[in-house]
A protein has these predicted regions:
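Elongated, amphipathic alpha-helical interaction scaffolds
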Residues: 1-313
Length: 313
């Protein structure tokens, strides 16, 4: 019964239903503090493409857009199934966030840094790590040094790396995590993957999550809606998994058929080649019987002298 009582709500459901409330900002702030490796204080939750609850929700993508105390924009997105051109859509979402949060007439100084965190439950591609970070830097073509930008802040010239200005992309490949959780980052990824939170966790945000994201803290109606959400994800994953298996079987069948066809074609080609070679050997033997030298036979048939000698043995 203890295990049941320690069951926790999935993070995508929490983002959609609970973490937008100011009283629950502690969970989200802890998550961002760990993944961005700096203290994060949320001052506002902004409207985003996927944060409305819609009747035709397919449970595929959930996102939340927040603004921190420095005015920077943070997008957290959870993607349950694969999507064609996923990175292109992430890029578009970041570009849209930048343009949406600068007013007409503002200078480019008002452009804010954007962090994009993607929590992925599908195989995006090949890689040995479970977290990948993408940042912009300018590297000297000949010198290989990193360009540092001079800019002005509060009448003071400061130097910045381009990565402090351009968006930062973080891809969390949840299904690739197979470690014993020791660090706060690993504890968070373990929760994202398995729904497990250690009773003695000290990871920012997870202490609050243990209290506020308990499954049995929800009402019967909320639990029913949550269970339907989980069922929808499982059904969707099963359908996609079966489609992949069927595709693989079809591919194997096509490969076998192609292999048989190629084998027949290769057999015919090899047979023809062997026939032509045997014909040349017969001609070489007849020429030798009629008194022609090995050198003359090689010149006429195109066979080497060594091949001529073999053909008459």
């Amino acid at each position: 019964m203890t295990e049941l009582r320690d069951r926790y709500i999935r993070f995508d459901w929490a983002i959609k239903r609970l973490l937008r409330q100011k009283a629950n900002f502690g969970v989200l702030e802890g998550f961002l503090t760990v993944f961005l490796n700096e203290p994060i204080k949320i001052v506002d939750i902004l409207e985003s493409e996927g944060n409305q609850q819609q009747a035709n929700d397919k449970f595929n993508r959930v996102d939340i857009k927040a603004k921190n105390s420095k005015g920077e924009i943070i997008i957290v997105e959870i993607q349950n199934t694969s999507e064609l051109y996923y990175l292109e859509r992430v890029l578009y979402g970041v570009a849209k966030a930048i343009t949406e949060h600068i007013n007409l007439g503002n200078t480019y100084k008002e452009v804010k840094k954007v962090y994009s965190i993607s929590i992925l439950y599908f195989d995006l591609g090949k890689g040995s790590d479970y977290i990948y970070v993408g940042q912009n830097n300018f590297v000297g073509l000949h010198t290989q040094d990193h360009l540092i930008i001079s800019t002005k802040e509060k009448d003071t010239i400061v130097r910045k790396s381009p990565s402090e200005i351009f968006p930062t992309y973080i891809l969390v490949r949840v299904n690739e995590f197979n470690k014993v959780a020791k660090s706060p980052l690993e504890e968070w990824v373990e929760y994202l993957k398995n729904g497990v939170i250690s009773p003695d966790t000290q990871a920012p945000g997870l202490q609050e999550a243990r209290e506020k994201l308990k499954y049995y803290s929800m009402s019967d109606a909320e639990r029913y809606a949550y269970d339907e959400h989980i069922n929808a994800i499982m059904i969707q994953n099963d359908v996609l998994g079966n489609a992949r298996l069927e595709g693989m079987e079809e591919g194997k069948a096509e490969g076998r058929a192609e292999g048989r066809a190629e084998g027949r074609a290769e057999g015919r080609a090899e047979g023809k080649a062997e026939g032509r070679a045997e014909e040349k050997n017969d001609i070489a033997r007849k020429m030798l019987a009629n008194g022609l030298s090995i050198e003359q036979i090689a010149l006429i048939t195109g066979l080497t002298e060594q091949e001529d000698r073999k053909s008459v043995v």
